[in-house]
Design a protein with these regions (language model features):
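Glycan-processing catalytic domains of CAZymes
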Residues: 61, 66-496
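N-terminal, immediately post-signal peptide pro-regions of secreted/luminal proteins
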Residues: 20-70, 74-75
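Low-complexity, Pro/Ser/Thr-rich intrinsically disordered segments
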Residues: 24-27, 494-539
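Residue-identity detector for glycine
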Residues: 11, 61, 532-533
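Compositionally biased, low-complexity intrinsically disordered regions
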Residues: 8, 39-42, 533
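Cleavable N-terminal signal peptides of Sec/SRP-targeted secreted and luminal proteins
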Residues: 2-21
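Intrinsically disordered, low-complexity, compositionally biased regions/tails
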Residues: 15, 65, 75, 86, ...
């Protein structure tokens, strides 16, 4: 196989990668080792993590939203096999759209130490073998045809053909690998793997979350995607003590999991990237500013070198003026300013395309300009739509924030790509079915949904009919626009260029090699984009 000099090849044995920089002198060695041939006036609902934790009786926190439609037309968008993210690049955040990845789904008997349904069903159904629709936590039903049957479990929810709805588990390595293969096929760069601090002190919970992290690492290395860790410190039971636990967990992951040694772990300015969500929110119980300041200082300059990071804070949407969802203590301004990166949570902060335009002008552009003056990387949130009917026990409408066939998300992508001070975007979230922000493959047609319960398909908005992989394809197009491979354009993409087939993993053991080889096509020579006033090559 022909290999570009800018690419690393990765072999994985028990999650311990062997890496070779591919150069003229090492291609043969690589082949031998790896066997390779003003603010918006609009009604918005924002829930806190504690509210969701109590609602769902689960460990993790969620933060969410609402909204309303405009008009659009959506036909197919073509994807292409993604090029491996160059592991030698120490500025891997440049010109990237990176997805949040929950990886929080499970079922009894899947091998996870928690041994129950997680995030598909609320208690009491979370503890039964065949749960029913009354305790659903999700509005979207993922497609099931590409997962191994052993990686799914039947529920008690009926399909129209008399079978039962099946659900996958993130504990299964091939499930996570499949998701990363979809990213690879559609040119999506990678993920922030979210690690919830709630419940992490419990051995079984910590092992479950570490199991998923291992799955994501392995999948990233096999597919050439990149990944980094995102800690979530939200949750009704969490206090300021969580900051000490977070530091201890990071040390453990660096020392025992060698997490930052992965060639696909995202690095910026020569440092591993770490994201901490929940800083400064009114709805989050972490309020001791001295402890927060101390933790940030430790990560940036006081920790032993192997634990230091490029630190991104997941912060409230009104962080800059300390109002609304942000704590008002002036000390938080200094905390925000001390971060390497600022990622405001924007899900639900607008509910129409026009209200997004207003929010973008009045808040996001001003946020990004402020960050540019401080030398802080600014990562706005992009999201496709929203619905949490089942999570809220029917008290919120189904399809609360319509997707408009993708036009709602594309408008955000266009505006972000056109903004001179925006160079990295957080896409919420790759696999989020609880609040229906998922971009991975979900049921496209209402007729194909389970017949029990209330569900949301991609054709819910009248006049829109898109395939199950539509948002994967749309994200890939947005990435190409963002890194300069196609022009920045407001026009919604409607062409369908030829798309490479999805690469399927082996159905054998989790540690076996995939049955297909990495794509060998050379990428188009990248253009350059402004990064905080400094021209930087595409990562």
């Amino acid at each position: 196989m022909k290999v570009s000099k800018s690419i690393f090849l990765v072999g994985v044995i028990a999650h311990s990668p062997k890496v070779l920089a591919v150069s003229n002198s090492s291609i043969q060695q690589a082949t031998n080792i790896f066997d390779i041939d003003s603010v918006v006036e609009t009604e918005v609902v924002v829930i806190s993590s504690s509210e969701t934790t109590e609602l769902a009786s689960d460990d993790e926190g969620l933060v969410a939203t609402m909204m309303n439609p405009d008009d659009a037309d959506a036909s197919g968008i073509g994807g292409e096999t993604g090029v491996e993210v160059a592991a030698s690049n120490n500025n891997m955040l440049d010109n990237q759209i990176i997805c949040g990845y929950q990886g929080w789904y499970s079922f009894p008997g899947d091998g996870a130490p928690t041994n129950r349904w997680r995030h598909w069903f609320k208690p009491p159904s979370a503890y039964v073998t065949a749960p029913l629709a009354g305790d659903l936590m999700v509005d979207m039903y993922p497609t099931t045809d590409e997962y191994n049957t052993t990686d799914m479990k039947d529920s008690g929810i009926r399909m129209s053909d008399g079978s039962y709805a099946k659900f996958f588990s993130s504990a299964r390595p091939n499930v996570v690998l499949k998701h990363f293969q979809w990213m690879q096929t559609h040119g999506i760069s990678g993920v922030f793997q979210i690690r919830f601090m709630a419940g992490l002190h419990i051995d079984a919970d910590r092992e479950w979350k570490t199991m998923v992290l291992r799955n994501s690492r392995r999948a990233a290395e096999l597919t050439g995607r990149m990944f980094a860790l995102s800690y979530d410190i939200a949750g009704s039971a969490i206090t300021d003590a969580v900051l000490d636990d977070l530091k201890a967990d990071w040390i453990r992951l660096v020392d025992t999991e060698n997490i930052t040694q992965s060639p696909q772990y995202i690095r910026q300015n020569g440092l591993p990237v770490l994201h901490i969500y929940g800083l400064g929110f009114v709805s989050v119980n972490v309020s001791d500013t001295a402890k927060v300041e101390s933790l940030i200082k430790w990560f940036k300059s006081e920790a032993p070198l192997q634990y230091r990071v490029f630190l991104i804070g997941g912060v409230p949407s009104r962080w800059r003026d300390l109002t609304g969802d942000s704590r008002s203590d002036p000390a938080w301004k200094g905390i925000y300013d001390s971060l390497n990166g600022i990622h405001p949570w924007h899900v639900g902060r607008w509910n129409t395309i026009s209200s997004f335009d207003t929010f973008h002008t009045n808040i996001i552009l001003k946020d990004s300009a402020y960050c540019a003056t401080k030398g802080i990387r600014y990562l706005p949130t992009m999201w496709p739509g929203f619905s949490w009917y089942n999570l809220k026990n029917g008290t919120s409408p189904i399809n609360q924030i319509p997707r408009l066939g993708g036009k709602f998300m594309w408008r955000q992508a266009y505006k972000y790509a056109a903004a001179s001070n925006i160079n990295t975007v957080w896409l919420a979230q790759f696999d989020e079915c609880d609040e229906s922000t998922a971009i991975f493959k979900v049921t496209a047609k209402t007729r194909d949904l389970p017949i029990d319960g209330k569900w949301l398909a991609l054709d819910a908005d009248a006049g829109y009919s898109v395939p199950s992989d539509h948002y994967l394809r749309l994200t890939g197009e947005a990435q190409k626009m963002f890194d300069g491979r196609i022009p920045v354009r407001d026009t919604f993409p409607t062409s369908s260029p030829t798309r490479a087939p999805t690469k399927r993993p082996t159905t054998k053991s989790p540690t076996s090699k995939p049955t297909t080889k990495a794509p060998t096509a050379k990428p188009t020579k990248p253009t350059k984009k402004k990064v905080g006033g400094v021209t930087s090559p595409v990562g």
